[in-house]
Amino acid sequence: MIYSELVNKACNIMFEAHKNDIDKGGYPYVFHPFYLATQMDDEYSTCVALLHDVIEDHGDLYSFDSLTEAGFPVCVIDALKCLIHDSSIPYMDYIKHLASDQIAKKVKIADLKHNLDSSRTNGKKAPKYKLYLEALNYLENN
């Protein structure tokens, strides 16, 4: 994981946003974005990994504007925008669109791999397991 002032800021926002959230396996949700952040190799993708679910899960408290005001650069904000799936758009169309942003693509690959890890959910496969595999295959090969 990359250590910087910006990453520290992202980490603090992530912990505050998800402090009471529990994942499907019964673990503190903060483990997920923190795990993704450890897979990243640069400052901006680390920030995106930490923040990737903050607006989607806590849009009542956080917005792209508030993250911009907090000092996150345009490339971080753009990647975060790509990572939010509008449910009116077919999932694979969303995946194909986000593949055009290299930061979003890198974070989504790590996110999909972690979501496909059945050890996170006490051995149960994710409900969208096949779709996630298809998305991962697409991103890794395009």
Regions picked out by a protein language model, each given a short descriptive name:
Residues M1-N142:
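Active-site helical microenvironments for divalent-metal-assisted chemistry
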